[in-house]
Amino acid sequence: VKEVKIAFMLKIEQRIYDIDRVICGNLDMMESSNVSRDLISQNLLAQSRNLVEHIAVRAYGQGQEIPLNRETVPIAMAYLKKNNKYLFLRKFHSFLQESKSHYTPDNEGAERLMLKYYQYFVMIKTFVKQEYDMNLLNNLNKFPINTDKTVAEFYEKIAERLKVNRPSIDYNRNERMYVHKVIPFIVDGMPYFEMVLTPAFDSTSKFDRFIVYSKNMVPKHYAIKAAIFYDDIEVDGKKMPVNIMTEYSVSIRPCEFNNFASLFGIKIKMQAASAEYIGMMNYLTNSGSSLLDLVLLSDKDYAICMRKMFGHSHAKHFEPVLNEARKLILSDQPGSNIIRYLLHIMNNKVLKLQRQNDNNKLLSGLRLKWGCIPFDKMPFATSLIQHNPEATELFESIDAEGREHELMARYIQGNMSTNSRLYTPIKEVEKFTENVDSQMDVFNDSIYYKHEGRRLAKFGQNIYVKEALDNTHCIMDELFHKSQNGLQGYADAITVWMEERQNVDSDEKKEILQKLFEKTHVAVIYGAAGTGKTYLINHVSQFMDSHSKLFLANTNPAVENLRRKVMAQNCDFMTIRKYIMSKNVPVDVDILIMDECSMVSNADMAEVLQKVNCKILLLVGDTYQIESITFGNWFSMVKYFIPRYAWHELKTPYRTKDEDLLTLWEKVRELHEDLTEHIVANRYASNLDQSVFDKKSEDEIILCLNYDGLYGINNINRFLQQNNPNSEIRWGLWTYKVGDPILFNESERFIPLLYNNLKGTIVGIEKESEEKIWFILEIDKVLTELDIMNYDIELLDPITPGKSVIKFYVLKKKNSDNDETDFSGDTDVPFQIAYAVSIHKAQGLEYDSVKVIITEEIDSMITHNIFYTAITRSKRDLTIYWSPETQQKVISNFQIADAKGDATVFAAQTHMKMRKIKN
């Protein structure tokens, strides 16, 4: 309905202008030195939700005077779900609910959020001018947005390409895509959108993400089909490919409807060509809403929408399913939170992971696995089976009202996994509730009976998770007891062994070897990158040559590195996960050697110690490198609870002889005050420019933190591939060229022969047909005919000594309508193009030349450990591409991770003696 223009101002518009005056008044205070930017940010955030809700009421009124009260706002917000042009308002409102109502931000957090929401204010300013001829936020430019100039230049050029008129095309034959991320950016006061997409198959990974740019915001919850044009921009004389999206439509996979229906015991076979399917997709595309939004409508609106969607359809397969879902959700039956979330995201892989063949009596008879029950009870504090929902998706699908106990627990869990802290101070969670004790009781009473270990408990002024404390206590107690007595005869035996061989390369290592098990049955070795930790492991292994040895590490690359470098007999190598999960593994061994200990979680370490029966332990790692993804601080903590003779530190690096580089590593490691000066003086820092694409060495790598974004791994790989002069072969969405460097992924097809992180180069590509392609790769591993006997691989004549040449095929994935053929291993390309790799993936690797890219977009995620890991990959040349502002922000936020605080509280609680450590 087209709104009639009115000559007078509506009361709701007057209210909007009142809010605008408050916001603009705060922006004016930016120029005052007496008012902190943090305070202004918090004030602006407080007004943002009011602004969005008032604009929603203005839209709902369609030019009519309507009362503004508590009842009107929810109706107005629901009205926004009827038209896709309001999508950005709904998204903004959802972000605000998540960040303001439930996570009261600290000063820095408020400012960061304001920067994030700046784009939405620009969208509001543009929208209200176009729709209602209202002039809002006229001094928004006073908020200082420090945009990276290089990134801004790219976006300006992309915006120019987005202004080009392109033909309308039939994109129905294009592949479906999942929308992974939608990022607004502003050029000349106009909003545009960067979107990260992945092919809509169950088996896609982060390596399959690619970026498109559009004038339109796209809803993120469902798969889409889109018109995508391949274009390029020119920067510093270099052409860089960009993908331009002009049109899209929601295109949920038919198998996702089938699998969702099966949760209710209803068997359907959705067809993409059916009137029913087309009607649903048209409605979802035009409205921008989700199927969850649909079932939450009033009876009257629901009936109208159902007629719109299914009016032209004779067969209505999914209508009964929606009716059942609506009935379950509106009556708040057991299982309703799961159905809410699944209906909101409709992701095939997630759906199938939750499903079972039998009815679950505790979940209203739905065919959902028992493991889904914790999520149904406390969705903000638990996960679905093999799926961790994003906070944004949770807030959009499930009402957080009355779930303060879950949000508090979520914060504590995040503090453990992100900051490696066993104890969370009570004062940090008081922002969720005024009565922490009562909310802890509510949480503990709601825990599923099989998850008693997740209970929250208090000690002093701290809160902790029971099983985390139990695991930590188990580790410290076991290692303490093993440190009380030495290995009888060790001192004499190791002395004789070293004298006979005369091959230990430094006095530092000789001294450590001499003392290693003299007084203890557990030895801990801390060492920086390149100090010879693996070298020392090899010597211990050779000394214990006739004894049974079990080598464990967290990742396959670390395991393979040990397998290659340990020259001893009686060895078993495996990942920690495999050791824990497998039955047929060695339990009784003479020595357990664990590498990369800083990456091992407390839960995994406790399980290993409970399973293995070993005489001695050697635990090796670097607390300054990347830590465990889940909570893991035992390796940093253990030195406070074992005698000083039981732990040692390797300090001399051997990876490089470059004195300036060695000094840089030390200054970063110890956080010296003159770190910035050293970086500048030795020209390690550079603004992001053309030189990032100019190779300094054949053995060179570019390191990025993330896969997405303009300077994410996937985009950098595409840019650098442009420099490869060989002809391109297109396969699906990706382009391959002879000469491209590659790294293998965690592909089930060739594990363990071709392991994750194995380096190689494409030396040949043969496209047999549109359905089949052959890759010929030179890999950094020597293989024989016997090695490949049980694999679908051809071994060709070698090109370079110490390497092998292999050949294998990849088949084209079938239509994404169905899921039966999705998991065929030979449809996945098992490697990624690797001109650039992630910092995490580079751990354990080394290169002559390393370039690290850090942009404003990801500066808050660069921790001290991540930065240290990145710069210590280099053997010779190092360049860090960042702006001076980003450099200052990253370095000023560095903190050395130290478990001393946790160790102090832990010692008081468990009465274990804590040892003083001299700096």
Q: Locations of the language-model features?
A:
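Extended, solvent-exposed polar beta/coil surface segments
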Residues: 1-251
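N-terminal accessory nucleic-acid engagement/regulatory domains that precede
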Residues: 132-135, 140, 145, 150-486
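Conserved, well-folded catalytic cores of nucleic-acid-processing
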Residues: 478-485, 543, 565-569, 611, ...
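Conserved adenine-nucleotide phosphate-binding loops and their immediately adjacent elements
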Residues: 488-501
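N-terminal pre-P-loop "Q-motif" helix
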Residues: 500-521
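ASCE P-loop NTPase helicase motor core
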Residues: 515-518, 522-681
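Conserved RecA-like ASCE P-loop NTPase motor core of nucleic-acid helicases/translocases
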Residues: 523-566, 620, 675-718, 728-735, ...
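Core RecA-like ATPase module of SF1/SF2 helicases and allied nucleic-acid translocases
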Residues: 531, 570-573, 656-659, 694-919
